[in-house]
Amino acid sequence: MGNVIATRMGVLTPSAAIVEIEEPVAQVVNASLKERGFEFAVRPGPAAGCEFLSGIQPWTVGQPLSPMLQRQASALFAFDLLSQNPDRRKEKVNCGLTKEGLVAFDFEMCFGHCFLPIVGGSRAEIWEPSKSGLAARHLFYAEMRAHPPLAGAVQSLIGRLTTEWWNETVCQLPVVWRHDADIIGQNLKAAATYADEFARDVATRCVL
């Protein structure tokens, strides 16, 4: 779901997909995993997948940002703070470059704070991302500190997360995922309600 929300906020991502894993496929995959020494296994049922992007170049930490890349990095910074994603940092960039610009991937830890509060490290409100302590560890913290995101631009990105859009998105999800989606949706609704406060926090306190 993080992938879909990031895309809605203007972040370039591989296209998300729901993949149905049948029992025979799971058996073949798990046998292969076991042969290779892996200790985990896949389960039959719906799973999240995404488009394979060929020709993506690795991101070099500290490389200069063009105006286009600065805008894309700002959108990604705002999304990662909204979702309290701790997994996009200098040691693990989880993004790359294509001809379209900065592409983000790996969203598995997004919104983890909705289910395991310790992940976020704070009982702060969703519109107070500076209190999560994650901003200073973000991949683009130095760039955002040098050129802070515009509060108006961040507020506009949050404004795309409408209740109507989210309800339509949830209707397309497998039933077994909808409970978690409802919890995430409550966070999105709160962020949209306090979009101005969220945007000002991202543009000021998050980049101190």
Locate each region found by the language model.
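Surface-exposed beta-strand edges and their flanking turn/coil or helix-capping segments
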Residues: 1, 26-29, 62-65, 112, ...
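Short, surface-exposed, charge-dense and proline/glycine-enriched linear segments
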Residues: 41-55, 95, 115-127
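Context-gated lysine
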Residues: 34, 90-92, 99, 131, ...
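Surface-exposed loop/turn and secondary-structure junction residues enriched for glycine/proline
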Residues: 4, 22-24, 68, 114, ...
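C-terminal catalytic region of ATP-dependent kinase domains
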Residues: 101-208
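Glycine-rich loops and low-complexity Gly/Arg-rich segments
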Residues: 8-11, 38-42, 72-77, 121-122, ...
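Conserved kinase catalytic-core segment
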Residues: 56-116
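Conserved ATP-binding subdomain of kinase catalytic cores across diverse folds
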Residues: 1-61, 82-86, 99-100, 107
